[in-house]
Amino acid sequence: RINSVDDKLHAFLSVNDSALEQARNIDKKIKSGEKVGACFGMPISIKDNMCIKDTKTTCASKMLENFVAPYDATVISKLKKQDAIFIGKVNMDEFAMGLTTEFSAFGPSKNPWNIEHVPGGSSGGSAVSVSSYECIASLGSDTGGSVRNPASFCSTVGYKPTYGLISRYGLISYANSIEQIGPLTRTVKDTAFMLNLI
């Protein structure tokens, strides 16, 4: 799906080349009767300000273009334990400072409902990737609307949790005292599911 629509939408900054291998490993677990996590086989995108070990984390900035995260954010560790498949890192306003996802050093994302319109931001890539069925869920971050705004613009569900509910360890945050990691999905039920896991 990413290959067929993302040239036009530009939700993704990078795609995880090992995603299919991860899926095959989950298939092996199922065939062998091993217990699988609650997210088994779910393709999930991650805003590019959250650390995934050994993966580029750019914050949509040329300043961090070659930064490779040395550890996993807590939310990533939790989703890995649930057998989530990280499909890739998604676009955002540079350092999460914006509400349109036009201010990425790697180019703007487009609204999947009308590419002449902005998708909102700063978690625009998250909302676009979910709305256009490139993934089932995404994690974004929200200081003053950065999950809720693009969710509204792209007709998805976005939730900013109460401050302190979700660990921010491994988030390169814009405003440490108020920023939260939150899920974006296509339904309220899926958002609640993701929130309970992270």
Where are the predicted features?
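Gly/Ser-rich catalytic/binding loops embedded in alpha/beta enzyme cores
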Residues: 1-144
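Fold-level recognition of mixed alpha/beta catalytic cores in primary-metabolism enzymes, strongest
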Residues: 106, 127-198
